[in-house]
Amino acid sequence: MRDAVTSLIRNYDTTGRYFDRDAIESLKDYFASGNDRITVAAMINSQSAEIVKAAANSLFEAVPELLLAGGNAYTTRRFSACLRDMDYYLRYGTYALIAGDMDVLNERVLQGLRETYNSLGVPIAPTVRGIQFLKDAIKEMAAAAGIANTAFIDEPFDHMTRELSEVDL
């Protein structure tokens, strides 16, 4: 797992360059958001069950057929698996949020996930919506805590949804 600083250093070291203006700005942005990242991670840690519950409620309200007979969240086992997966996305999204780098998501979450879901018949679209509802719940909490710039919250959750949504042409 890498973080924003390690990734930046690796990129510049590979090409044998000193940090340029863009690199310095990237570092400034990352460190400037550090306290907010930690605050949000602490909020997620203390309220993870509530965040997953709120996101699941939003998902099942938006896509109620998931809970009907034949739906992918029908039966206690499938419903529990859905909540477990949402918690998994929340946890790894939090790691990436702190790191400021999506490497942990690529390595531990996304690699092969779309193929696995497709082979099991798990629809991707509701998964993507659920991840977006997680992001929305976190952004609401951050705004309520007075965090004005929440763009760093978008990064990991948008990355997951973008990667899961990709379609090979």
UniProtKB/Swiss-Prot annotation:
Domain of life where this protein originates: Bacteria
Chief subcellular location: membrane
PTM entry text: Contains one covalently linked bilin chromophore. The chromophore is added by phycocyanobilin lyase CpcUS.
Location within or outside the cell: Cellular thylakoid membrane
Membrane topology: Peripheral membrane protein
Transmembrane segment boundaries: none
Binding residues for (2R,3E)-phycocyanobilin: C82
Keywords from the named record: Antenna complex, Bile pigment, Chromophore, Electron transport, Membrane, Methylation, Photosynthesis, Phycobilisome, Thylakoid, Transport
Residues bearing the modification N4-methylasparagine: N72
Entries under InterPro entries matching the protein: Allophycocyanin_b, Globin-like_sf, Phycobilisome_asu/bsu, Phycobilisome_asu/bsu_sf
Pfam family, any one: Phycobilisome
A biological process term (GO) from this entry: photosynthesis
SUPFAM superfamilies on file: Globin-like
GO cellular component entries: phycobilisome; plasma membrane-derived thylakoid membrane
Protein family: Belongs to the phycobiliprotein family.
General function of this protein: A variant beta-allophycocyanin (AP) which forms a complex with ApcE, a phycobilisome terminal emitter that influences energy transfer to photosystem II.
Self-association and partners: Heterodimer of ApcE and this beta chain.
Protein name from the UniProt record: Allophycocyanin subunit beta-18
